[in-house]
A protein has these predicted regions:
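N-terminal non-cleavable signal-anchor helices
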Residues: 19-21, 26, 131, 311, ...
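Bacterial Sec-dependent N-terminal signal peptides
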Residues: 1-43, 66
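A detector of low-complexity, intrinsically disordered, Ser/Thr/Gly/Pro/Ala-rich segments
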Residues: 1-4, 8, 88, 219, ...
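Predominantly soluble domains enriched in secretory-pathway, periplasmic, or organellar proteins
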Residues: 119-121, 141-486
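Hydrophobic alpha-helical segments, principally membrane-spanning helices and signal/leader peptides
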Residues: 11-12, 29, 111, 283, ...
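Generic N-terminal helix/loop capping motif
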Residues: 23, 80, 103, 107, ...
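Aromatic- and Gly/Pro-enriched helix-to-coil junctions and flexible linker segments
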Residues: 28-157
């Protein structure tokens, strides 16, 4: 009679064992990482499998570890576009300018290879994975919903940097400062060296000229698309100035027998070329008066500026103004700019390390203001009443109070500062530091597809007249000119 009880107990024990086994098997299945859902960061699925699972990991580029990993957080598509301490890592449509691609790539036939290879101290990505990332970037690096970063707001505040070593214009977000797009400029395979960039007075367009080119090019600021170009013949087109109504431009050819090209910016047609061989010598900087009737052009290799009456811009008259009657070193006037009210104009004199100030009505010298070594470009803040002057050899920006006509501070900004631009909305000044091999400046973080040595951006806080602490953003090769679109 005991046998049935024993069998019943065995049956019960067996059922319990099966239940435990099923529970254990179920737990193992739940622990399988291949089955676990994960936060894809709103990357496309195939991209998320690579970036989220292999890059945005503990000890590397996730939110918790980013400070020890160059400040780069790859946890989400949005945080990726904040970049790292050196700037943007992903530039939509440009894997050839994206360090995210450089540092995962191990095959030079696919593009740039940089060290150390990422993921750090782990097996490198397969070629298929590298191609997935490269092709995704070249398609605009869209998110999980197909959206392209920075394409949502045609009125976005931005600033532009012309990188003359690569024929690239960097389009920077005014909030994060990162490069949103790289625009190839020029119309020839050879490097044409974009030397100056300017946003139109109404903020609708930007223009660029070249020291080894034959055009001025026009682009829309809403989407940075090419609009048109005006043929102005081959020359060393260094600088240009735009009338206050945005309809006309004068472009200067820096050559021994220099020229000025007068262009209608609405039709993008060359209307006239001003020249006087043997007399109009090495012109460089230029500025048009607020009323649009007087054009000033500096003659960089001497003591002269040229004053043109362009009331009739097709048949102008000009005169020569001597700006240094004190003897000694030549003034070598580089650039010229009007005060906000138009009553004065300022001339950087690189040969004498000073800014000279003149009365617009009489062209009489008002003041000679000492600067740091080799003053070049200028940008004015009407709100602060400051004139900011890059001094390339002095590695500084000299700040001049335009109400008292005195220098108030020299700010060390970086190696070989050249272009700069005031951003009134942000109370900042953007400074492009060329950082060429002869400068003694810091080695760049990386080398891009065009080779050469990258420059970098620093920022002055206009409230404190100090650099923004810890900010140094890598640019492309030989950044030369900056312009703001507010």
């Amino acid at each position: 009679m005991q046998i049935p009880r024993i069998l019943k107990s065995i049956r019960l024990a067996g059922r319990a064992g099966v239940a435990v086994l099923l529970l254990f098997v179920g737990a193992c299945k739940d622990d399988d990482p291949k089955q676990e859902p994960f936060n894809d960061g709103c990357y496309p699925p195939k991209v998320a499998e690579i970036i989220v699972k292999k890059c945005a990991t503990a000890g590397c580029h996730n939110t918790q570890s980013k400070d020890a990993a160059s400040g780069l957080d790859l946890s989400t598509w949005e945080t990726m576009f904040l970049g790292n301490r050196n700037g943007a890592v992903t530039v939509p449509y440009r894997s050839d300018q994206s360090t995210l691609f450089y540092f995962i790539n191990t095959d030079t036939t696919l593009g740039i290879v940089q060290q150390p290879t990422m993921p750090y101290n782990l097996a490198p990505l397969t070629q298929a994975e590298v191609l997935t990332i490269r092709n995704w970037i070249d398609a605009g690096a869209p998110n999980c919903n197909g959206q392209i970063k920075f394409a949502d707001n045609p009125n976005r505040k931005k600033f532009y940097v012309a990188n003359q070593g690569c024929d690239l214009v960097g389009v920077h977000d005014a909030v994060t400062k990162v490069v949103m797009r790289y625009i190839e400029v020029g119309n020839k395979p050879a490097i044409e060296s974009p030397h100056m960039i300017k946003v139109s007075p109404d903020g609708q367009f930007w223009y660029v000229v070249f020291i080894n080119g034959d055009v001025i090019q026009k682009y829309r600021t809403s989407d940075d698309a090419f609009v048109a170009e005006a043929q102005i013949s081959q020359g060393a087109w260094n600088t240009f100035t735009i009338s206050s109504d945005g309809t006309r431009a004068w472009i200067v050819d820096f050559s021994s027998t220099g020229r000025v090209a007068y262009v209608n910016l609405q039709s993008m047609q060359l209307e006239q070329t001003y020249s006087d061989p043997g007399f109009f010598n090495s012109p460089h900087g230029c500025a048009i008066s607020p009323d649009g009737n007087t054009l000033y052009v500096t003659a960089q290799l001497g003591n002269t500026i040229y004053k043109w009456d362009v009331t009739d811009p097709v048949s102008p008259d000009y005169e020569e103004i001597i700006i240094n009657n004190s003897g000694g070193l030549n003034a070598e006037p580089h650039e010229i700019a009007f005060s906000p009210d138009g009553s004065k104009y300022f001339v950087t004199c690189q040969g004498r390390d000073e800014v000279r100030v003149f009365d617009s009505a009489t062209d009489a010298l008002i003041a000679a203001i000492p600067t740091a070594d080799f003053p070049l470009e200028m940008s004015i803040s009407p709100a602060k009443n400051y004139l900011f002057v890059t001094c390339e050899i002095g590695n500084s920006v000299t700040v001049i109070d335009i109400s008292t006509l005195t220098a108030v501070k020299d700010i060390f900004v970086g190696f070989q500062p050249h272009g700069l631009a005031v951003d009134e909305a942000k109370n900042q000044v953007y400074v492009a530091n060329r950082n060429t091999p002869s400068s003694g400046g810091p080695p760049p973080h990386h080398t891009s597809s065009c080779g050469g040595r990258n420059g970098y951006l620093t920022i002055i806080n206009m409230n404190t007249l100090n650099l923004v602490n810890g900010f140094k953003m890598e640019l492309s090769v030989d950044p030369y000119s900056v312009s703001v679109r507010n």
